[in-house]
């Protein structure tokens, strides 16, 4: 199944080239035609494998798991962000997509708490919840949709209204030709004049509707962009209290809030989640994969200057640039099941060793 995404614009293979020689344009042509390259499913599976290695390090670090295992996980979030951008762009129902991620976010948050209460393994702290990051990303992408709807070219509704009025006048003029005979020309002029006057108020009304729509969509976009930040403010009074100052009631209220609140303050990858709306906004530009990779590289450079190993996220651009626009295998619910399952299994195993 193809997904219509603006992948790299490529030329066809050089037909005049010598036999057996693969030109760069021919390579990109084959990637785009799905004979080479990676599908959405392939990129997701690369992320899953790297994620498991990273979480092995997380759960078994106190048992001597080498620190370099953590490096494998640095591109993972970026790969999942990219897959989410593609998925949100092509889903049949964005609302259902968001609801599904939100439910998984809450379930994963509850599972983290239950595992730590029941297993009580001190070697790893469970804060894993990629679903929260992805759901926050969908809020931001919905904001981008609002801005795109507000600022895209609507077409000249006033002109179309004017044209409709003139055509209406012509039709009325045509009937006048049959009735009035020799006064047809005068009727035509009068009819057109009346239609123009009738069209002008409709034209102004269409313009006001368009302006109102744009204002509405712009406001919706701003509110959606601000929402994950505003929801973070709800948590601050609880987090300001020291561990010893929190009552049992406050602790449980905080646990409930952290389960249901899509606050960017709680995101596993914090502000890196902002990569999602950036990549989403770039999805339809020419050479979109290149520009999305540039955005990733900019963030990676920032982490490099900060001295953090997260700069290794730059390696995510390799599979992203090889994306061929194909969906690949379905397995719609695989990740929703595998992610919490592998966290639980690794956490329990680590507690038993």
PLM region descriptions:
Residues 1-353:
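Alpha-helical transmembrane segments and their immediate juxtamembrane cytosolic regions
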